[in-house]
Amino acid sequence: MISVFDLFKIGIGPSSSHTVGPMVAANLFLDSLTKQTELTAITGIEIELYGSLAAPGKGHAAILLGLLGHAPSTIDTRLTSQYLSPIFSEKQLNIAGKHVIAFDTERDIHWYDETVLPYHPNALTIRVLLTDGSHYQQTYYSVGGGFVINEEDATNPDEDNATPTINVIPYPFNSAAELLEQCRQHNLSVSELVLANECHYRNQSEVFAYLDSIWESMQDCVTRGCQNSGILPGGLDVKRRAQALHLQLCAEKNQPITKNDKLAAMDWIDLYALAVNEENANGGNVVTAPTNG
């Protein structure tokens, strides 16, 4: 069963495959690296982007943020430029915030947009050079929705780990029809049944606390989107529109809304959707549902 902990993740825009995934991959690499060597033994680092990850161009900021030690769920996206500034101005990378090495994005990031690795088109390799002349590297695949697997798991899946967990949850289902049938048989609502499945792995307070954090992040995203103005990144000079629409709707708020005035409610729904869309395009914190797209 795919958990709500998997479906709804706090991430960074604009793409779960091209920003959240690579950032997670960098986090995983740091975890693996620290088990292999001391950070002080690192003399250099190289990044290779393949296929679809290389095709959009210089969208490497998410990987660099991950190597700095930032995670998609906790990074303050308002400070992204501040975090990245030393890399571009001083040509230095502070690995995990603990060890500074020389790093030149033009020299140390390699783009192979016409090379597609066997498992998935969204692939990257991170390699560190060590003081003894050796190196340590890992290849990762960003498979969508912020999910990442390493090359070892992709080429040699563990059959035990690959066994679906659907058989051990209280109310297994493989389709919406099966979900509704389980609800009918056990006299449960959809929300009650899903909660029971979630609580098979973690206690209810943990589930509710996580969902509260997701809801708070969603609300914050809408608020930021309604407040921020300017031009969206990407080079197309697209102007943000949510702030102006928000001001317009607020000016009309004293006008009575009748019970059947569905169009008035839709104006606010459209505003919230636009606000989130613009925050995502701007590289802000958003919630995957189940992807940024």
Predicted regions and their residues:
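Catalytic cores of large soluble enzymes that bind and process phosphate-bearing ligands
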Residues: 14-17, 21, 54-58, 75-76, ...
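Conserved phosphate/anionic-ligand binding catalytic regions in large, soluble enzymes, centered on
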Residues: 8-28, 59, 281-292
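Accessory carbohydrate-recognition regions in carbohydrate-active enzymes
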Residues: 12-55
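Phosphate-/polyanion-interacting regions in eukaryotic proteins
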Residues: 133, 141-145, 163-233
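Buried hydrophobic packing segments
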Residues: 22-29, 66-70, 273-276
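Beta-sandwich/jelly-roll carbohydrate-recognition scaffolds of carbohydrate-active enzymes
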Residues: 40, 45-188
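Conserved catalytic cysteine-centered active-site region
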Residues: 1-8, 12-13, 74-80
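Accessory "access/gating" subregions that flank catalytic or transport cores
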Residues: 204-292
